[in-house]
Design a protein with these regions (language model features):
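Electrostatic cytochrome c docking/interface patches
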Residues: 19-38, 266, 329
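Periplasmic/extracellular electron-transfer cofactor-ligation site
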Residues: 30-32, 36-62, 100-107, 309-327, ...
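Gly/Gly-Pro-rich "capping" loops immediately C-terminal to redox-active cysteine motifs
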Residues: 33-36, 44-78, 170-178, 291, ...
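Axial heme c-ligation environment in periplasmic c-type cytochrome domains
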Residues: 52-61, 70-107
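Beta-propeller domain segments
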Residues: 110-123, 181-190, 194-196, 204, ...
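Surface loop/turn motifs at the tips and blade-to-blade linkers of beta-strand repeat domains
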Residues: 132-137, 174-175, 190-191, 251-254, ...
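Asp-box/WD-like beta-propeller blade repeats and closely related beta-sheet repeat scaffolds
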Residues: 225-271
C-alpha cells in the first residue's frame, strides 16, 4: 500500500512538473524566438528608431513581401550574414520578424485583448459600425445565425446554447454530447480532450430542422488506452425548446484512430455544397507520418452525404467489398492539410473553400478540389518555429513534386493565424458581394478578400485590433456576425 502511494505521489509530482514546464514554455516562447533574439543581437543597434540606420521595423520598404525583404537583406547585409554565420533560413526568419513588427502582430500570448470601435469605420467600399450583441464565456468556437434572428453559439468547454433576439444567452442545450474541462489553459489557449467545435444548419433547415454539430468525441478506459483519447465526430439533431432531440451520428472513425493530441488542432469545421454533401475538416491530430496515409482521417477534408452515408464518387473509396471497416479512406476528399480552421461554400458556384494555418508563415486560402493534395508538410511558404525550414516531409520520405499539389489561391506570410470565414451574400453591403470575409486570431484582423477567376484582386483590412476573431457568419438579415475569442471567464 505504501509503495502504491509513493508511486501515485511520484506520478502526480511528475505531472505537475510537466504542466509547469508546458506553461513556462508557452508563456516565454515569444522572448526566446530565434529571429527576435538574432534581430536584437545583430540588427537592432542600427535598424530601430533608436539606432543609426533606417528603421526597418516601421519606416522602410513597408510593402515588401517576405521574399522581397529576404532578398534585400541578402544583398545589403551579406558581410554580416557571413561573419555571423547565419544559417540560410535565418535570413527569411529575420524578414518575417521585421514584417510581423510592421504589421503590429502581437505574440500569441498577448493576442487576447479586444476592443470594439465606437466610431464609424471607413473602408474601401463601405463605411460601417460594429455593435456588441452579447458577451459570452471563455473559449467560444462557432456561431450560426438562425432564420428567426436567434444565434446558435458553441463554446469549446461548455457546449451549445442559443442567444435570443435581445442578445440574452440561454442555458446550455440539454442532450448534446458531453464536453470536458480543459486540462491546461495558457494565455487563452486550451488543451482539452473532448470539446464541442462547429455548428452548421442543413441546407433545407427551414423544412427539416436538422442542425449539425462537430465535436471531439472522448473515449477513456474502454478504448485500449490507459489515458483519455479523442477524435472529431459529426452528429445531427433538432432543437425542441432547449433540448437536443433525434440525435444521430453522421460521420465518425474507428476508435483505433482516436489520439492523445489535444483538440486545439482538431479543426472540425463544417460546410455543405449545393448538392447537399457535407464536409468536415480534420487537423493534424496525430503524428505527421499519418497525414498522407489514406486509411487515416488526419490532415484531411472528408465528404459525406447529409444522412451519414458515403458518396460512391469519393475519390479514394475502394467500394464496400474492398474497404477495411477501420479505415477512413472512404470519406477522404482532400489531403495534405495542416490545420484547416475555416470552411465555407461559394454561394455562386457551390464550391468549397478552406482557410488553413501554416507554421511561421504559410497561412492559406484554398479552393478545395476533389482528390487534391495540398502539400503539407513537404511544401509550405512558412518556416518552423525554430527558424529552420520545415523538414519533416523529407524526413518522412514523402516524395512528390510541387506540380502535383494544389497551391493556395492566397498565401499569407507572415501568418495572421487565419480562422473561419464566410462569403458575403447579403443586401446590407452590396459592394462586398461574394467577397470572402476572413477572421484571424493572432493578427486580430477581419480581412476582406476579393477573388476573381482564381486570382487575388483585393485584400483589405476591414477591422484591426478587434480581438481574436474565431468565426465569421452571414445573418439572414444581411449583416455580418463575428465571434470574438478571449481568455476571460
Amino acid at each position: 500500500m505504501l509503495k502504491a502511494v509513493k508511486i501515485a505521489l511520484g506520478l502526480l509530482s511528475l505531472g505537475a512538473v510537466v504542466v509547469l514546464g508546458v506553461f513556462w514554455y508557452m508563456e516565454t516562447r515569444h522572448e526566446r524566438e530565434p529571429s527576435r533574439v538574432t534581430f536584437l543581437d545583430h540588427c537592432a543597434s542600427c535598424h530601430t528608431a533608436s539606432g543609426g540606420g533606417s528603421d526597418l521595423l516601421t519606416q522602410y520598404h513597408t510593402n515588401d513581401s517576405a521574399d522581397e525583404l529576404t532578398k534585400r537583406i541578402l544583398v545589403q547585409h551579406s558581410d554580416l550574414i557571413k561573419s555571423a554565420q547565419f544559417p540560410e533560413p535565418m535570413v527569411k526568419a529575420l524578414a518575417l520578424y521585421v514584417i510581423e513588427q510592421r504589421q503590429e502582430l502581437p505574440s500569441i500570448t498577448n493576442s487576447h485583448a479586444h476592443t470594439i470601435p465606437g466610431h464609424v469605420v471607413e473602408s474601401l467600399h463601405h463605411d460601417f459600425k460594429v455593435e456588441l450583441i452579447t458577451k459570452v464565456g471563455k473559449g467560444p468556437y462557432s456561431i450560426e445565425p438562425l432564420p428567426d434572428g436567434r444565434i446558435l453559439l458553441v463554446e469549446k468547454v461548455r457546449g451549445l446554447s442559443v442567444i435570443d433576439t435581445s442578445g440574452k444567452q440561454g442555458a446550455l442545450v440539454d442532450g448534446t454530447p458531453q464536453v470536458w474541462p480543459e486540462i491546461l489553459q495558457v494565455g487563452g489557449s486550451f488543451a482539452v480532450l473532448g470539446s464541442m467545435l462547429d455548428v452548421e444548419l442543413h441546407p433545407d433547415y427551414a423544412t427539416n430542422g436538422w442542425i449539425y454539430l462537430s465535436h471531439s468525441d472522448r473515449c477513456q478506459l474502454d478504448c485500449g488506452s490507459p489515458w483519455p483519447i479523442s477524435m472529431v465526430r459529426v452528429i445531427r439533431g433538432r432543437l425542441a425548446g432547449n433540448r437536443w432531440i433525434d440525435s444521430e451520428v453522421i460521420w465518425s472513425v474507428d476508435k483505433n484512430k482516436y489520439t492523445l493530441v489535444p483538440d486545439a488542432v482538431a479543426s472540425g469545421r463544417l460546410a455543405f455544397d449545393h448538392q447537399g454533401f457535407g464536409y468536415v475538416t480534420v487537423g493534424g491530430k496525430s503524428t505527421y507520418d499519418n497525414l498522407h496515409v489514406m486509411d487515416t482521417p488526419y490532415g484531411k477534408i472528408h465528404r459525406f452525404k447529409n444522412n451519414g452515408s458515403v458518396p460512391e464518387d469519393n475519390p479514394f473509396w475502394l467500394g464496400k467489398q474492398l474497404s477495411d471497416p477501420t479505415s477512413s479512406r472512404k470519406t477522404v476528399w482532400t489531403y495534405g492539410h495542416r490545420t484547416a480552421q475555416g470552411l465555407s461554400t461559394d454561394p455562386r458556384t457551390g464550391k468549397i473553400w478552406a482557410t488553413e494555418m501554416g507554421p511561421r508563415g504559410g497561412d492559406e486560402i484554398n479552393l478545395i478540389q476533389r482528390g487534391g493534395n495540398y502539400g503539407w508538410p513537404l511544401y509550405t511558404e512558412g518556416l518552423d518555429y525554430n527558424a529552420e525550414y520545415i523538414s519533416i516531409g523529407k524526413e518522412l520520405g514523402l516524395d512528390f513534386e510541387f506540380s502535383e499539389t494544389i497551391p493556395p489561391v492566397v498565401d499569407f506570410t507572415p501568418a495572421p493565424s487565419l480562422s473561419n470565414f464566410t462569403f458575403h451574400n447579403g443586401d446590407q453591403f452590396p459592394n462586398w458581394q461574394n467577397d470572402l470575409l476572413v477572421g484571424s486570431l493572432r493578427a486580430q484582423v477581419l480581412f476582406r478578400i476579393r477573388i476573381e477567376e482564381g486570382k487575388l484582386i483585393e485584400k483589405e483590412r476591414l477591422l484591426t485590433k478587434l480581438g481574436r476573431i474565431r468565426d465569421v457568419e452571414m445573418g439572414y438579415d444581411g449583416f455580418v456576425y463575428l465571434l470574438i475569442e478571449h481568455n476571460q471567464t
